[in-house]
Amino acid sequence: MGLCKCPKRKVTNLFCFEHRVNVCEHCLVANHAKCIVQSYLQWLQDSDYNPNCRLCNTLLSSKETARLVCYDLFHWSCLNDLATQLPPNTAPAGYRCPSCQGPVFPPSNLVSPVAATLREKLSTVNWARAGLGLPLIEVAEPVDDTMSHDETDYRDWSVVNSSSDNLSETPETTSQTGYAYNSVPTSVAQHSLNVNMSQDHAVTIRDTGSDSLTINAGSSPRKVYDTRETARGQDAVIDFDDDKYRRRPTLSWLARILRNRSGSKSRPASSMQRFLVILIIGVLGFLTLILLMSKLGRASADNDPNLDPLLNPHIHVGKE
């Protein structure tokens, strides 16, 4: 057992083999994340340590590390690769520490900085989220972009040659069809433009001839009214016809004074006013209580036989 040198001054049995100091779990996570840390008894038995990862045999300081609840330290990438090689239906108890065969997942009732850091790191991969009881992360499937953009079939060129004669008749048919759709007089188009000016706009396309095409767009977007302003105004001033002659409560003026009209911002004047009102009410209540108690005490004293001088045997009235 030893005392950690951090400001917390916690008693701990953990010992950093590299810096040769006692460390608590808070310092272990903050300042000794890549150090070999075990119990002080192990240090007394054997002070030698291996600074390399036991999975890839490279320095632990070269990559990101992950410390299990048994305090064994590994490269996070090596531990992740080792876990992904197991079958997807492996139970959480099947994930074991490569060094001491301890559990990889911290117990649910364990509360410590090391366990919290390990849970946060394990929650980033799917194989560990299932063991922690978290929903899996959806992995987007890569889109195959190897499809050719030009999918034109040039195998049958005879169809193009045979239909070349029919293409010459297409402009005439197209012009006739266009005339059928564009047979709207100019006056009618302008009339529709003048009528629909207030509701929706009209676009007039004029050709070289006397034909034109009028395209009426959809109605303009409706205006959205904010009902919160109306509700806010009702809270501030209530002066409707139905409520104008309604009987108000007796203490409505007091509630109106005590209510904070400025929202979260309180003015000094309103605070002083509320304080004075509360003070006056308190004084009036105190005086009323004193008056009531005095009347009740006098009434009880008048009816008390012990205070009646005629009933006192030691007092003789009208006798010599």
UniProtKB/Swiss-Prot annotation:
Keywords: ER-Golgi transport, Golgi apparatus, Membrane, Metal-binding, Transmembrane, Transmembrane helix, Transport, Zinc, Zinc-finger. PANTHER family: ZINC FINGER PROTEIN-LIKE 1. One of its GO terms (biological process) is vesicle-mediated transport. It comes from Xenopus tropicalis. One of its GO terms (molecular function) is zinc ion binding. It is a single-pass membrane protein. Belongs to the ZFPL1 family. The chain crosses the membrane at residues 275-295. The lineage of its organism: Eukaryota, Metazoa, Chordata, Craniata, Vertebrata. CDD domains: mRING-H2-C3DHC3_ZFPL1. A zinc finger (B box-type) spans 1-43. Its main location: Golgi. It is found in: Golgi apparatus, cis-Golgi network membrane. GO terms for cellular component: Golgi apparatus; membrane. Residues 161-180 are annotated as: Disordered. Residues 1-274 are cytoplasmic. A zinc finger (RING-type) spans 53-101. Residues 296-320 are lumenal. InterPro entries: ZFPL1, Znf_RING. This is Zinc finger protein-like 1. Required for cis-Golgi integrity and efficient ER to Golgi transport.
